[in-house]
Amino acid sequence: AGTVDPAEQQVDDQQTDDQQADDQQADDHQPSESDDTAEGQQDAGSETATESETDPEETADADADESEPERARAQIDSLSDRVDEQVRIEGEIVGARQTSGPTVFEVRDETATVDCAAFVEAGVRAYPEAETGDYVRLDGVVELRNNELQVETDELEKLEGDDRETVETRLEAALTSEARPDDVDLLADHESVAAVHGRIRDAAEEIRRAVMESRPVIVRHNATADGYVAGAAIERAVLPLVRDEHAKSDAEYHFFDRRPLEGGDYDMADATKDVTTMLDNRERHDEKLPLFVLVAAGSTDESRDGLELLDIYDAPRVTVDAGYPDDGVADLADVAVNPHLDGTDDDDLTVGVLGANLAAHVNADVREEVSHLPAVSYWDDAPEEYTDLADDAGYDADHTTALREAVALEAFYQSYEDKRELITDLLFEHEKRDLAEHVGEQFREKLETELDTVEPNLSVRGANGVSFTVLDTEAFTHRFDFPPTGVLLDEIHRRELGADGASGDEHVTLGFGEDEIHVRSDGRVNAREVAADAADAADEAGISAKGTRDGAIEYLTGERDAALDAVVEAISKRL
């Protein structure tokens, strides 16, 4: 037998002790049968106790949830102060469009409009039950994307019953209150304008309501200097309202458009184009039908068919005109602003005066900005009250003349385009006077060159004490260059060229074209009456009228000489 080292004996003893401790610990963790029974009873008791304790708590939580107050509604015009916050808004869906990503609902309340993006998956329509015209309650987070406000939608509920009625009533009350313009004075004392002051207020209300309803406003105006002045005045008033109403930076290009009328009337060609565009926008972008504002157009039979087409689709319509109307045409507009409809026979009133006053009612903030426009709209003999207004605004007579001539020249080129920015620079940027003077100088040079060409070719004839200056526009004008026939005849008549060569106190200028005669007088020559008389005298010429006072007489090319003789005779007898 060997001898055991004391150190080794100590290690072995320690290992033995450790093993015994481990075995005892394992035994402690092995439950006995009695332990199992006791533990089961304890677990069952605990479970029962837990159930009895949980049910009242859950009920209490549910009751608390039910009694929790509803989230407060936020007004849309306050969202700029609540970026990154959770909000609830209520309003009307005024537009819905599907992008390659989310569905974007344009929601309007009584204060403003905002885009709300809802996403289920890329390109898939979210909340298909919600459409334009529905009233909704929407919860989401306000975000700023590309410097524009947008609500990221968490939940959207289409409102029905009392909830819908509450929101609809709230919005309608706000619309009625906000859309009606305040009592605004006219720009100046003018009897003819005062006669239609109520109509101007009504027209302003229609325009303001359209903006608040997110309904596009389309201004269609005659492509003359006067028409441009009136259309630009309305544009100047509406654009700030659109910017205030819509958060998107490009809203002014979607919700307002100004389109010149090349032919001067709102005929079927113009109406067909507009209706095609509006139906396409409604189908593709869920847009509301626009409000059409016809300026220096929409009063004569030439516009009847176009207005009737808009009426079929129930597109709202406003007409603003200073020209003599045909019977019944004004009834096709929701609001017609024309002093002749109220028995005021003022041929010296321009549509620019009406347009500037309408603009001041649509948006009182632009009153000073448009106060010089009435003076700009007169080619000669502008009323003193309007020249005084222009002087007060810093526009002297030379400046207003330059503006008028510059706009007349630009109206001729690209006549179907609105030229928004250029017209704005000319009419409203006072510091850019040199631009107006430069373009106005071009106007005068081109006009004088053409007058030098045509004056030797003017013919003068008389009938029944009336002198006629006749220009064969087919033979002696550059028909496709500036100035157009209308501008040229206006200047010939203002200067009374040829009048000295004929006897008679009455003077009429005629532009004798291939198949029509344009009339310029003191406003007393009604083309419809003249056409009716001339048709009896030249029954094979196919004579008809286009327009009313100082309008045009149309005829067959092969009977142009007979038509001219008949028209001269008819006018002279009427005067």
Outline where the language-model segments fall.
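Hard-cation-handling environments
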Residues: 379-478
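OB-fold and OB-like beta-barrel modules that bind single-stranded nucleic acids
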Residues: 84-95, 131-144
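N-terminal accessory regions of nucleic-acid-interacting proteins
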Residues: 33, 40-41, 55-56, 61-63, ...
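Intrinsically disordered, low-complexity repeat/linker tracts enriched for polar/charged residues
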Residues: 5, 9-10, 14-15, 19-20, ...
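Short, Lys/Arg- and Gly-enriched loop/turn segments at beta-strand edges
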Residues: 100-103, 143-152
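OB-fold (S1/OB) nucleic-acid-binding surfaces
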Residues: 94-122
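OB-fold nucleic-acid-binding modules
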Residues: 36-88, 157, 161
